[in-house]
Amino acid sequence: MKIIYIHQYFKTFTEGGSSRSYYLAKALVANGFEVEMITSHNSRDYVCAVIDGIRVHYLPVYYDNQLGFLGRIRAFIAFMWQAYRLAARLKNANLCYASSTPLTVGITALLLKKIKGIPYYFEVRDLWPLAPAQLGIIRNRWLKKLLFRAEQTIYQEAATIVALSPGIASYIRERNPGKPVYILPNISDCVFFRKEHKNPQLAHKYQVGGKFVITYFGAIGKVNYLQSLIEIARKAQQDHCHELAFMVVGRGNELRQIQAAAHKYNLKNLQFIPHLSKYQLREVLNVTDAVYVSFAPYPVLETSSPNKFFDALATGKLCITNTRGWIAELVQENECGFYADPQKPDDFLAKVSYYLADPEALEQAQYNARQLAETSFSRHLLINRFLKIFETKVPAPAIMTALHN
């Protein structure tokens, strides 16, 4: 069976960012499927490479988190058309697996179905256009109406939908009753990431020896709301909480603004680290005690399935989230961290002080995080669930029952 897998932001294991599509595509290849991955890169030329059995087509579409709204839209549209033209030339494809965001990836899949007769599965990582609409990024009511109509058509025409969180699945099921919808969250790589003792050499390298380290890693944009972490670090410095150190790892179009705020407050307890590879990130997480998962206070963002959270679980870190929703519920139910109101730095510091004062409680929470990763989100477990979707002899409703039991 030949599958066209479309993901604009495909990353291999050695690159920074989410490796979800790499792992899923690799699993398909290992189970006898032929996979043609269509993605993009920032080079000027088309490149085709075979990576662990996956034939990866890199289209020359520039994209960076620093891009503004119009720049991103141009990149989305360019990739949509280039991906369609390439996919339409691939022979003997049986199925398209399209992973959003952006929503335009779904339009590529829809065109393949309508013009080439290739059915598609649609993976929904974020609710788009609901997210940019709630955040006020898309304001024109006619454009919003057009995008929501396109979203609904993509859902209706998909043979199957894969949602990355319960909230996303509920949203889609309400609008598409009877449509097969699978919940397949992001993956905790419990093989690459492990719960480790702090390495003194790494603590010295990052100048955090003897500190309780709280780390944010990932994109730095409007949706990530890192102003909240700046205010926490500011309050900690004002209150002479010298035990605390903060690290921000990543890049994005609000990085300069966040750095300017840190400079304005003369924060000595916070450092910025550029975007890292997986191996470099593992070093930073070795010296980290708690990971901060941050989103702006919009309801749609409560449905997110942030890759950073699952990496934090795998490394056995105290998980702190400033967003309500299924992640906060998971953290609280499994006693591996806490929710902290982003508008109340005092609340954050009070909750952290409990773990500062009780190392055994910290160790237990970190152990619970690793256990949650192993029992609910491990690569082996979720890949097996993913592969069940492609068991053609099993009707989709039967697969759904199997996944929920």
Residue ranges, per PLM feature:
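Nucleotide-sugar-dependent
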Residues: 224, 277-284, 289-313, 320-329
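A short, well-ordered alpha-helix in the C-terminal region of glycosyltransferases
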Residues: 347, 354, 361-375
